Amino acid sequence: MNSSLNLTSNLIFLFFLPLLLWSQPQYTISTNNGAHPGNLFFHVGGQPPRTVNIMDSTGSLIHSEPFGLKGWAWKVNLNNKITYFDRQSKGWFVMDSLENVVDTVYCQNEYIADNHDFLALENGNYILFAYDEQPYATDTISPEGSPDETVTGLVIQELDSDHNVIFEWQSWDHYYMSDYPDINYSSNGIDFLHCNAIDIDEDGHFLISNRNISEITKIHRTTGEIIWRFGGAQSDFTFLNDYPFSQQHCIKSLGNNRYLLFDNGNQSDLYTGGIKRSRGVEYELNLSDYTATKTWDYVHPDSLFTPSIGSIQRLDNGNTLINFGNNQNINRGSVITEVTETNEVVFELEMDNGQNIYCANKAEWNFYSEPVVELNELNQQKKTQLTIYPNPSNSTFFVELKNQNETFRKIEIFNINGDVILSIPFLEQSTINIFPINEKLSTGIYILKATSNEHSYYSRICISD
């Protein structure tokens, strides 16, 4: 709820959420002091039960639910709705704050959506991608190649709200395997373009993270031309004060030519004296001389090396949330760390060994639960004294105070985001205790707050077609 639903301090909000204790993730919180106030969203992979979770700023789980093959990349997306991937149907699910699945999004043109990343935009469009396996005579490139190899490319699609393709990009038009000398041509199947993240830069063009070639690529959103490449064998940029990132995840545009990513660091030992380590890192790119300057990084005090998965998020208070996703090489679960701009740790959570998290994100968002309001114990007993009828309604409905000694002082109606959409004040000397609402409301669920001369009450009103 936003500030428009700023209830008095003695209101009690009871959240009726499916906390299934037997399936909750197992973790330890070692630090929680001054962290960002948003809720933490994460999906636990590995062995069942695979839960989707929301944790509040105190470290308490307020939502934990086993999702089976669903739930991958569980997060609040750009359209202010939860999105997650279903590994069985190969589609992205979009869920509103009432826990209704309001859309399911699949790749078009016979491509199969990949589970790594997905953008649901404010304008209703969707951006997703697919891996595209094609036969390739790699013996024409390398003596270790095969005349009938299978090579994985990439297809990016932008769909409108009706799932029509308005942009499609194919990597085969822009990438050449011969440009990348580190490809292992003796492997059975070559995962050439292993895209694991997509973002939109401040100028509207796409950013993608290609893990296996250690490259961040910027792609023109209408022409499909590659604008620049950062990292890897074909990098347009020279690193000034840092070693190259490798096998990275989670590219994020910060604006002003600054970019944030999770550097898995699979090749970091070549630059750190033989020690592999993962980190969060931020760069500023100079588009005049094509140089890259490291402006921030964070290496965990335990020098965690996360060979796969991981994520990073810059929060609106300047803190950075880092998910060291796969620590099975040292028999540890995922480690989620939040640090300030000066790298002070203000939050750290570690999952039990075997429980891995692909991505972790914070947002000031939660599923809607109808609040039960009590100003005192007597008011709690009297909350049935408010009646709304008919409910559901498709036209005029009535609000009635059952206690004849109570009269209205104010009636307010809120949408599920907590925005006031109707406010009706009454005179102090009003004797009205039944009142018709004639306002035409859109179909949906609303919260009605009735303030009387004695109490405040809340109830749900459903507007039907």
Residue ranges, per PLM feature:
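C-terminal outer-membrane/trafficking sorting elements
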Residues: 56-57, 379-389, 393-465
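Intrinsically disordered, low-complexity Ser/Thr/Pro-rich tracts
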Residues: 2-9, 66, 226, 408
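Residue-level detector of functionally pivotal "anchor" positions at catalytic/ligand-binding pockets or at interdomain
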Residues: 24-27, 364-389, 402-404
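A generic structural signal for short, non-catalytic loop/turn and secondary-structure boundary residues
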Residues: 16, 35, 291, 381-382
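Compositionally biased, intrinsically disordered/low-complexity regions enriched for serine, proline
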Residues: 15, 22, 34, 298, ...
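Histidine-/acidic-rich catalytic cores in large beta-rich domains
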Residues: 24-373
